Amino acid sequence: MRFKTRISNLYTLTRLVQALDKIGRFCWLRLMPETVNFVIVPDFRMTQVWSVLEVETIFEDYVVQSNADNVINLEVPIDNFYKALRSAANASDSTVRLSKKNNQPLLSLSTTWSGRAFGSNIVTHNIPVRVLSQSYVSVIKEPTAPEPDCHIFLPQLNFLRHVVDKYKSLSDRIIMSANMSGELQLSVNIPSARVSTKWKGLENPELDPSQVEDISRHPSQTRAPEEFVHMRLDSKDLVNMLKISSVAKRVIACFCEGHALVLYVYITDPEDEHTAVLTYYISTYVD
């Protein structure tokens, strides 16, 4: 089993791990010849987070070898990984490799620091990890969801977080509603009161014809644009997701009525050469 690579895009990798650090303690890091997966499947909630990146998005001189079709699965403590990446911010070169010490697998991040007076200096952070068997990870599947009934860009997450923080004290369920006319609403219904906050003038992203066979028959196109789709969500799930407000550049929310709220969280700018996206699957609740 062998893994070694240079980090070519430290900024994007650091932002990705920073976002994950706000969600859970450990992530499943799946290293494959063409792609790198970061996955969080919390045991205590029904929300899952998946990110699939092409290798060249963050790495170069990439080598991964194993007896399992050159796939390596690791359980990585996110906080330790994030701290190591953050410390490498101004390094001239950074590499990551899988190593072992006293039978403990390690993810070793080595950073090179160049100075005029004393030449180069190399600092290595060793992060204890757990190697996951293929049989263990084979039962973890990315959720599937039907085509969305509504898709909309969310407003700035800081604004949403402010509202959700207030509403969670009123109820453990928050209703998120949206339509194809650029409207989004958060509301709480309790016996003593009904409170809501509405945003207007948001953008509904266009569907990609290469991804949708017949756009005219897509669920988001067959209902009236002003008709709302309602999702009843756990307030804790929303609070957990909104912790990434400091690193998210833009978020597309896909409302799959009766199934799940799927959120595509972009942590890179549209003009960036490579795109890094986190996909959240948040289960909905039926009254």
From Swiss-Prot:
Cellular component per GO, a single term: cytosol
Matches recorded under InterPro entries: Cell_cycle_HUS1 (IPR016580), DNA_clamp_sf (IPR046938), Hus1/Mec3 (IPR007150)
Cytoplasm keyword on record: yes
GO biological process: cell division; double-strand break repair via homologous recombination; meiotic DNA integrity checkpoint signaling; mitotic DNA replication checkpoint signaling; mitotic intra-S DNA damage checkpoint signaling; nucleotide-excision repair; telomere maintenance
Keywords from the named record: Cell cycle, Cell division, Cytoplasm, Cytoskeleton, DNA damage, Mitosis, Nucleus, Phosphoprotein
UniProt keyword NADP present: no
Pfam families, A to Z: Hus1
Chain coiled-coil ranges: none
Residue ranges crossing the lipid bilayer per the database entry: none
Description of how the protein assembles with itself and partners: Interacts with mug40.
Database matches in PANTHER family: CHECKPOINT PROTEIN, MITOTIC AND DNA DAMAGE CHECKPOINT PROTEIN HUS1
Record function comment: Essential in controlling the S-M checkpoint that couples mitosis to the completion of DNA replication. It is also required for the response to DNA damage.
The protein's name in its UniProt record: Checkpoint protein hus1
Organism, as annotated: Schizosaccharomyces pombe (strain 972 / ATCC 24843)
Top-level taxonomy: Eukaryota, Fungi, Dikarya, Ascomycota, Taphrinomycotina
Encoding gene, per UniProt annotation: hus1
